[in-house]
């Protein structure tokens, strides 16, 4: 079967798309990736050996403006280019991971009568999924709660595909044991970094260390704050590992007693798969506050605590971390809640749905 996978734009679309594409290729299908020509795509697909189609695309700003008109025109031009490329090389089915990068391939597929499978990573559907869900053959999602935000309710909950090396590690690494000799805090600001979060957490950790508590921190700061945060920990004598980013996250998740982090879809999926308790501080500038919606779903499941960034303060954060250090049983319950909600075969589940649609079997009853 020939399958097109539109997963360009951001890491949050590329990596789950690649994870699913790998499974589909392992099952013997011919896979073509459709990307949007963004810088983040190049390193992500460097090990991809299959064909790639790149059609330049960009996001559509909210509201009416000259910039929005230009962006809409470019999206229309991209859709025409996609149709021109797709027509002589018709796939049997298109999997689109959302974002503006999927608009062109989805428009092309629908106009050519090619079945479309959409995947929504977040609880709150983005504009692309909301727009095209009524015409797609199937819509998959990471969260059960997504069905409350779409007109169609037949959402297939597959979970969020994560990078294949992480998924393999999540299945093989033993569950984390709380209550060990030294409490390990993982701090992640997300792909954009998080200056205020970095400052507050580092100050809280230093204060806790000076108070005589044994604490270790693994702090992924983003590029801008790496040197400053590393020096702050060094000057205070804190047991700290500081890096801008980290590719090999499996041993880091395995070591963490709790994470303080954002609540993007990939982060949520990885926390669940590795059963890491977390304090989630949603990125306040996220479109339609979708990270807060993700975090509240995680909180409802008992897997995380949530605090808006505007409510963070040094005294509150210090008390929270110390409280976690003193109540390992509570962290163990959060970890168990994560484990019960995790969907560690998300890429396999999504791949199976795509194959079912491509074979014309989706929705068929025997």
Where are these regions (language model features)?
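Conserved nucleotide-sugar phosphate-binding/catalytic loop shared by glycosyltransferases and other
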Residues: 3-8, 25-74, 223, 310
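A short, well-ordered alpha-helix in the C-terminal region of glycosyltransferases
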Residues: 330-344
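Active-site-proximal region of nucleotide-activated glycan assembly enzymes
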Residues: 30, 51, 110-171
């Amino acid at each position: 079967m020939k399958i097109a996978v539109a997963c360009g734009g951001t890491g949050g679309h590329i990596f789950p798309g690649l994870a699913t594409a790998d499974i589909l290729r392992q099952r013997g299908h011919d896979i073509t990736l459709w990307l949007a020509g963004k810088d983040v795509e190049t390193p992500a697909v460097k090990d991809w050996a299959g064909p790639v189609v790149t059609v330049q695309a960009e996001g559509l700003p909210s509201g009416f403006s000259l910039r929005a008109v230009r962006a809409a025109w470019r999206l229309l031009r991209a859709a025409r280019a996609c149709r021109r490329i797709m027509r002589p090389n018709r796939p049997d089915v298109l999997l689109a991971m959302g974002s503006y990068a999927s608009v062109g391939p989805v428009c092309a597929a629908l106009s050519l009568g090619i079945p479309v499978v959409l995947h929504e990573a977040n609880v709150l559907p983005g504009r692309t999924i909301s727009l095209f869900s009524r015409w797609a053959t199937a819509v998959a999602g990471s969260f059960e709660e997504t069905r409350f935000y779409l007109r169609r309710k037949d959402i297939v909950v597959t979970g969020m595909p994560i990078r294949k090396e992480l998924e393999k590690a999540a299945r093989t690494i033993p569950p984390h044991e709380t209550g060990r000799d030294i409490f390990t805090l993982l701090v992640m600001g997300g792909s954009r970094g998080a200056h205020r979060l970095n400052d507050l957490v580092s100050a809280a950790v230093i204060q806790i260390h000076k108070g005589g508590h044994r604490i270790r921190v693994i702090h992924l700061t983003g590029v801008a704050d790496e040197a400053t945060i590393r020096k702050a920990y060094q000057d205070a004598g804190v047991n700290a590992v500081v890096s801008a980013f980290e590719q090999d996250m499996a041993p880091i998740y395995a070591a963490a007693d709790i994470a303080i982090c954002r609540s993007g879809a990939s982060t949520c999926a990885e926390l669940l798969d590795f059963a890491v308790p977390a304090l989630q501080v949603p990125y306040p500038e996220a479109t339609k506050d979708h990270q807060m919606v993700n975090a509240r779903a995680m909180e409802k499941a008992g897997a995380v605590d949530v605090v808006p960034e505007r409510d963070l303060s040094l005294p509150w954060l210090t008390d929270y971390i110390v409280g976690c250090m003193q109540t390992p049983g509570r962290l163990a319950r959060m970890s168990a809640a994560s484990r019960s909600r995790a969907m560690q075969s998300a890429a396999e589940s999504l791949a199976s749905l795509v194959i079912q649609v491509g074979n014309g079997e989706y929705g068929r009853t025997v």
